[in-house]
Structures are given as structure tokens and as C-alpha cells.
């Protein structure tokens, strides 16, 4: 499956000058919502991701996603795996489990995002699950930015990766784009202003 082709055809592989949530700049941005707005594509990608997880013999009771980016990917993955889906969300800046969701002690939870960059939000969701007695068995995403190493990839984890090295990351593809500190950004040097994705219809 050519994941990059699917992202391009969906208009989800954006080019420009973007301000990332990390505060760094990049000439590229992945907008998974553009892929996931098509239920057939969402189902196809989730089934492909589920195959990886099942082939690895990972036992999953529940898929949990951090809101809001991971919701559609996580729901479709849970459907493909035949398990339930829950999500965490921020309240007063802290990732929490709300809306009556509960997890049982020892429940095997897989954390799913649409895209993993450093894995910060995914790790926050994982800690919330562990705090409630669940066992986080793995992490998954449709796309991986190449900061954290996914299973089957030769690209090693970088120091910025926040995911634990003893838990497997499943993803369909690596998307490695240039990322710059603002003071080292060549686009800024040319006088370009960065756009925060979502702020101007992106």
C-alpha cells in the first residue's frame, strides 16, 4: 500500500511554511483529516494497520486515542481489531479520561494517533491509562514523522522521541520532512511568515 500516494491524492500532504505544535518550522505538513474524511480510505488504512498489530501477536482489549487528532484513526482501528474505543482529552491543560469512560486493572490498551511526531500526546494518554491500572501494550499511528522508530523501519529514534523504547510503535509509513528551529529556518530568512496549521483553513 502506497501511503504517501494516498495522502497526496487526498490533498493531505501540504507544502508551505508551517509552525508546528513543537514551535519548530517545516516546509511540509501532514493533515490526516483530509484522508480520514473519506470513510472508505479510513477503513482501508485502519485494516492495514490492524494487520500489523495482529501479525505481531499483540493482544488488545481497547484502543485509546488522545483527542482530537487521533479520534477517527483510533475509532477505525478499534473497529478493524474488533475491540472497544475510548479517548482522552485535555481539561485545564491535562490529558484526562472523561465522559464516563473507565478501564479495568490489567486491561490491555493500545494508544493510537493519526500522526506520531515526538509522541508527546500519545505518551500523556498512556500515562493516564497506566494511572488507572491499565496496561499499555503498544502505540500505533497511520503516519510516523520519523522522530520515533516504528517497527519495520530502519530509521532510528531521535532524542526528541517521548515514547518508551520497550513498547512497539506500529505505523504505515515514515514521512521524514525537514524541521527547523525558528532562528535556523531558511524560509524565515527569505522573509516568509509561518502558518499555524488550521489557523487559515489548513
Curated annotation (Swiss-Prot):
**Which biological processes are named by the entry's GO terms?**
'de novo' UMP biosynthetic process; pyrimidine nucleobase biosynthetic process
Classification via NCBIfam families: pyrE_Therm (TIGR01367)
| Enzyme class, UniProt record, top EC level | transferase
Q: Give the multimer and partner information.
A: Homodimer.
Q: Got any disulfides in this one, which pairs?
A: none
The GO terms this record gives for MF are: magnesium ion binding; orotate phosphoribosyltransferase activity
Q: Which reaction does it catalyse?
A: orotidine 5'-phosphate + diphosphate = orotate + 5-phospho-alpha-D-ribose 1-diphosphate
Q: Which family does it belong to?
A: Belongs to the purine/pyrimidine phosphoribosyltransferase family. PyrE subfamily.
Asked if the record carries the keyword Transferase, the reply is yes
Which PANTHER family does the UniProt record give? OROTATE PHOSPHORIBOSYLTRANSFERASE, URIDINE 5'-MONOPHOSPHATE SYNTHASE
Q: Which organism was this protein described from?
A: Nitratiruptor sp. (strain SB155-2)
Pfam families in the record: Pribosyltran
Task: Give the keywords, sorted.
Answer: Glycosyltransferase, Magnesium, Pyrimidine biosynthesis, Transferase
Please tell me where 5-phospho-alpha-D-ribose 1-diphosphate binds in this chain: 113-121
Residue ranges spanning the membrane: these are: none
Q: Which domain of life is it from?
A: Bacteria
* Protein name as catalogued: Orotate phosphoribosyltransferase
Amino acid at each position: 500500500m502506497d501511503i504517501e500516494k494516498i495522502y497526496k491524492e487526498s490533498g493531505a500532504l501540504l507544502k508551505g511554511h508551517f509552525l508546528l505544535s513543537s514551535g519548530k518550522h517545516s516546509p511540509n505538513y501532514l493533515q490526516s483529516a483530509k484522508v480520514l474524511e473519506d470513510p472508505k480510505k479510513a477503513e482501508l488504512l485502519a485494516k492495514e494497520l490492524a494487520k500489523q498489530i495482529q501479525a505481531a501477536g499483540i493482544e488488545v482489549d481497547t484502543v485509546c486515542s488522545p483527542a482530537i487528532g487521533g479520534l477517527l484513526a483510533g475509532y477505525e482501528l478499534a473497529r478493524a481489531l474488533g475491540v472497544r474505543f475510548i479517548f482522552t482529552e485535555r481539561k485545564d491543560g491535562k490529558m484526562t479520561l472523561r465522559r464516563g469512560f473507565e478501564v479495568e486493572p490489567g486491561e490491555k490498551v493500545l494508544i493510537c494517533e493519526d500522526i506520531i511526531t515526538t509522541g508527546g500526546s500519545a505518551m500523556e494518554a498512556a500515562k493516564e491509562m497506566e494511572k488507572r491500572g491499565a496496561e499499555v501494550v503498544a502505540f500505533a499511528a497511520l503516519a510516523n514523522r520519523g522522530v520515533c522508530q516504528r517497527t519495520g523501519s530502519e530509521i532510528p529514534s531521535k532524542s526528541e522521541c517521548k515514547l518508551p523504547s520497550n513498547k512497539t510503535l506500529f505505523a504505515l509509513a515514515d514521512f521524514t520532512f525537514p524541521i527547523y528551529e525558528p532562528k535556523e529556518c531558511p524560509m524565515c530568512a527569505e522573509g516568509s511568515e509561518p502558518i499555524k496549521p488550521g489557523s487559515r483553513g489548513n
